[in-house]
Amino acid sequence: VGEIKLDCGRIVGLTGYARSGKDTFARILVDEFHFKRVAFADALKSDLASYLGISRTRLDTEKEALRRALQLRGASLRAVDPTYWIRLAMSSIKYYQGAGCNVVVTDVRFPNEAVALRNMGAVILRMRRADQPLVTEDADTSERSIDMIDPDEVVLAD
């Protein structure tokens, strides 16, 4: 993992467009380096499953079909409280840090998420594929805001 120190309690935040390799990179950190995985969207997925009356497993297996519903639900609660999802994720991160674990956050999409993680000492990595299409004007806010995050390093995921 390059020059990133893997001592106890380390936090790595991953940012990048959809299908840029964030989950694949996180899986390597979890499987090979024993990181604990956290996502800002974990609580959102549980919330949406409850709201729609479906299983959480269904959200994970039908990810593409339900992506827009996740985006809308996340945005609606973020409009009321911009730190809502951040506070929920921070609880998990602090728990793992307290247990001496390294943590990878797989879905840093908004600048305030990156700031919150950096305030905890995180390094932010931007995942990029060489063939990654540019984000279009009609892309969701969560995709467009990724470009406002200044990463510590860019990882080419090919």
Label every model-predicted segment.
Residues 1-12:
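Extreme N-terminal, non-catalytic leader segments
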Residues 14, 105:
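Hydrophobic anchor at the beta1->P-loop junction of P-loop NTPases
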Residues 17:
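P-loop (Walker A) phosphate-binding loop of NTP-binding proteins
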Residues 22:
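Conserved lysine of the Walker
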